[in-house]
Amino acid sequence: MDWPGGSLVQMGGFGDDHDRVGADGPPATAFEAATSCSTTGYVPYDHLMRPARLPDGFGIRLDPKVRTYSGGRVLIGGSPTRMLKLAPTAAAMIGDGFLEVVDQQSAAVARHLLDSGVANPRPMSTPSAADVTVVIPVKDNQAGVERLLPVLKDLTVIVVDDGSEVPVEPRRACPGTGTITVVRHESARGPSAARNSGLRSAQTRFVAFLDSDVIPRAGWLELMLGHFSDPGVALVAPRIVALDPYGTALARYENMRSSLDLGRKEAAVKSGSPVAYVPSAAVIVRRDVALECNGFDESLEVAEDVDFCWRLQAAGWRLRYEPVAHVAHDHRVQFDKWFARRAFYGTGAAPLAARHEGSVPPMAMSFSTLFACIAAATLTRSGLASALGALLFTVYRLRKMFNGLSQPTRIAAILTAQGFVGGFWQLASAMCRHYWPVTLLAVIASRRIRRLAVAAAVTEGLVDWYRHREPGGLGPVRYVFFKRADDIAYGAGLWRGAFDARDWAALKPRITK
């Protein structure tokens, strides 16, 4: 790939045989990733990214999971996984894994490494907080506004009261502070309309959307604003953590596995990647870009934040997830309300599938991975032999791509093994979450499938507990109970949404050759 100043970076594709997919888990069939997230799919917008030169002083650092070979001239990583070959000049720029932009060449290399997902930004400058307006959409939550506003005392704030029965009075909540403007809707129009009203009323370069049930932690704004020193970034989101992490058992589960908490790892936000979207409970956007993209879709009652992220991405903008910045959320911890909310989230998959074709498959893997997983799951001699044969063929096929590197067979074998584990994880998750009604019917009909389903439900739950365990969190037994209830609720909503829409695209797996 030619960049100003010479051919410094070449991105080696792994051929059309390999899926460009990703989500929360290890790669499957070497270059797929297992998914437990309903909004995961392929990455359709990479080629649309706008050219935007990084400023001098901007830094990047290689992601810790990226593997380097040939003295740093070959990088394997990113999401989806890819191989990048660096010219000696480019490799020298990132000798210790860090690159600072100082000229056009280093800016081009840094941009490509960022967009490939093998590096993360290290901004050197931060826009002023005076350039930010905070928009708080609220309905019938005076207490939440009273709790939130004191944290924002030095910022310009717009409170959008979306038809509350008793009008919200922010001045009562926080007297004597900075500029607070109230925009009232006479009747409730929904959170998207409330956010859009605040967006149109703001006059600053950046708008921070904060729901009335959140509390930002110290330093949240500065950590997020730094990413906007990259002119190609349109949205930044913090990590959503629990406001009360140690209450009831359900509160502790939410602290470990909230659908709003996207984890500890910083990432670009891309459809089909480990962080496919960010929740709108707390985000900062460029105001002009959000207006250009028509803000949030007011016709959507659910998943409007996912749709907004993907439309920004389709317009060529970059989005970042910054987990060092924390915003605490008052999670629902009454079981009936929590269960209903999880089911409500599931109904959002159908409208997303209609708007963003191919972006919400419950499973995404190659046929060879699916075949190997199903064959191995039979636990028969012929099945295990067939699975081994499929894996050996994958190693052979991948090895040819790594000719010229040291130990190409070892590299191919590691990636294949990771892919196989990822495929199993993806299949087990889908059985318990997206396809649990089908699994239930199969369990009734077959004793062998019954044993397999129970083993998958227990094993997947325990592994998920281990990956998300927190100090003071739930033990494995109660965690698995809540995880399975979580999956049943979401899956029920998924099927109901598809049935109501008479559109089954959200239930279709993507199986490639």
UniProtKB/Swiss-Prot annotation:
Q: Which InterPro entries match?
A: Glyco_trans_2-like, MftF, Nucleotide-diphossugar_trans
Q: Name one GO molecular function term.
A: transferase activity
Q: What is this protein called?
A: Uncharacterized 55.3 kDa protein in thcA 5'region
From what organism does this protein derive? Rhodococcus erythropolis
**Where is the organism placed in the taxonomic lineage, from the top?**
Bacteria, Bacillati, Actinomycetota, Actinomycetes, Mycobacteriales
